[in-house]
Regions:
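TPR/TPR-like alpha-solenoid signature
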Residues: 9-13, 63, 67-70, 110, ...
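Hydrophobic/aromatic packing residues within the alpha-helices of TPR/SEL1-like helical repeat arrays
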Residues: 35-38, 83, 90, 97, ...
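Flexible helix-coil transition and linker loops at the boundaries of alpha-helical arrays
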Residues: 41-62, 79, 95-112, 141-155, ...
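Structural motif corresponding to the intra-repeat A-B loop/turn of tetratricopeptide repeats
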Residues: 79-80, 126, 168-169, 215, ...
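TPR/TPR-like (Sel1-like) alpha-helical repeat modules
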Residues: 456-474
Length: 508
């Protein structure tokens, strides 16, 4: 039995050395086999029912296994950019920590709440907000309970993780937790004013600007972005130029440009885009991986402005430039989902503005082809971002079919989108953009039901669409536009069918 335990450690060490020499992760099935092997080993290490190993030996093996598991997690985090496998190994580390304590060990090499914090970080990176939220809250609660004097930096970090998890579920709560995160750093700054704390505070402020923009508080988003730029300029003077500051400045200009666009101030939007791009070029020269995401927002905003000015082919050209930008991105899964997003945007421009439904359908199919390599893999089927990309593909394809009067194909694609949304609702039932898509898709299907004289189905879908969109009306903008569309349809079809579909006075 001792020999068997030793062999497992030898094999794991060999596998780790292999990983260390590679630039891409090996076949997922191989990784899964090692994960199962580690789980089996951890489960077998129980001093109470193990006649071959002393309690000391069990604890020692668990300790060494935890150390090795942590190494695996770090290599997937930092070198292979694979959050899914990093999460798998952090979950094993948590199991080992609990097993260690269960076997009477009190000197585990790090706090359990730190492992929960890492797990929250990876769920957040995988866009699984509900699990990111629960793990971050657990980490914060355990830290406050077990630490005599909790570290303000950890309090700040965990509050920011909770804020990120709330961002697309409860925006007001998200802003509140970002402010709590900053409060902890401001208190710490009174003791020791330092670069890391100031960067943490400005990052929270930038995220608050993003949320304001997402919930259509456009004027507030502009004010918040300008405030962030003032602070960043002061930090620039204080600390000098570095990649992180240049990244935050270009990122803030990308938010400001989109906020100006939403306020229909296209001149200031274009000025912000140019300033953002000038900073972003420095990131691109240094191969800073985040520059792709910032250029994405800047180019996308410029594309929207071009569409407003009816320069549609120029807008499409810019989207194709974005394809080149993302082709250099390191992380394959994110690269493919972003490329898929761009094809969806190209499809929308062809469909909505140019009435080129054939080109729109072809672009949507290219989007499916790009994401197919991942969404056919069961490991990625539950990833929220992948699901949302596939959902948008189907909705956009359905819209193109609808405009081309290919109604049966439109119904099929809208229905496929609804099927994906059922999976998404199981994961994130309150996500704002998901509720919007759900209400819109039901509305479109209701219109098609009425076209084919399916009154009962159409009325049912329209009532569900209305109930959903009522929860979004308070955010204004596109949400209020959809609310009015659905409400007007209800009024029209109630008159046509001479009866109430839903009580109209329930609007929030």
């Amino acid at each position: 039995m001792n020999e068997q335990h030793g062999l497992i450690f030898d094999r794991l060490n060999e596998f780790f050395e292999e990983l260390n020499q590679q630039d891409v992760a090996p076949n997922q099935e191989v990784i899964e086999l090692y994960i199962k092997e580690i789980y089996a080993e951890v489960t077998s290490l129980n001093a109470d029912n193990n006649p071959y190993l002393s309690r000391h030996s069990v604890l020692e093996r668990l300790y060494n296994l935890a150390d090795l598991t942590c190494d695996f997690a770090e290599i997937f985090e930092e070198k292979l950019f694979n959050h899914l496998n990093a999460l798998n190994f952090r979950n094993i580390e948590l199991k080992i920590a609990k097993q260690y304590k269960m076997n009477g060990g009190n000197d585990f090499w790090r706090n359990i709440w730190e492992i929960y914090a890492d797990i929250a970080l990876h769920y957040s990176a995988l866009n699984i907000d509900s699990k990111a939220l629960s793990n971050a809250k657990t980490a914060l609660k355990l830290m406050i309970r077990t630490e005599a004097k909790p570290d303000p930096k950890w309090i700040s970090f965990l509050n920011s993780r909770i804020a990120y998890a709330y961002q697309d579920i409860a925006p007001d709560k998200s802003i509140n937790y970002f402010n709590k995160s900053s409060d902890a750093l401001i208190e710490y700054n009174k003791v020791k004013d330092c670069y890391e704390n100031n960067m943490g505070i400005i990052l929270n402020d930038i995220n608050i600007a993003i949320i304001m923009l997402e919930i259509n508080q456009v004027d507030d988003a502009i004010k918040q972005s300008l405030k962030c730029l003032d602070t960043l300029n002061n930090l620039f003077e204080k600390y000098g130029e570095n990649e992180e500051l240049v990244n935050y400045i270009s990122h803030t200009y990308s938010i400001l440009s989109r906020a100006y666009f939403e306020s229909k101030d296209y001149d200031n939007a274009e000025k912000a885009i140019e300033k953002g791009l000038s900073f972003c070029k420095r990131l691109q020269e240094n191969k800073f991986n985040n520059y792709c995401e910032i250029i994405d927002v800047l180019y996308s905003t410029k594309s929207l402005i071009l569409c407003e000015k009816q320069r549609y082919m120029k807008a499409i050209e810019l989207q194709y430039k974005l394809l080149d930008v993302w082709s250099d991105y390191k992380e394959g899964f994110k690269r493919s989902t972003k490329i898929c997003d761009i094809y969806v945007e190209i499809s929308m421009i062809f469909s909505k503005y140019l009435d080129e439904q054939g080109m729109s359908i072809e672009s949507a199919r290219l989007a499916f082809r790009e994401i197919k390599q991942y969404t056919d893999n069961e490991l990625f089927m539950s990833d929220k971002y992948a699901l949302s990309v596939r959902r948008r593909c189907y909705i956009n394809l359905a819209d193109a079919y609808f405009r081309a009067r290919m109604y049966q194909s439109a119904i099929s694609s809208y229905t496929n989108a609804l099927d994906i949304m059922k999976e998404e609702f199981d994961m994130e039932s309150e996500k704002i953009s998901l509720v919007y898509s759900y209400s819109y898709t039901l509305y479109q299907l209701a219109m098609l039901d009425f076209k084919y004289n399916r009154k009962a189905e159409g009325c049912k879908r329209l009532s569900y669409s209305y109930r959903s969109v009522c929860t979004l009306k308070k955010y204004g903008g596109v949400y209020e536009v959809l609310f009015n569309m659905v409400r007007n349809a209800l009024s029209t079809y109630e008159k046509k069918f001479d009866g109430k579909i839903i009580e109209l006075d329930t609007a929030q």
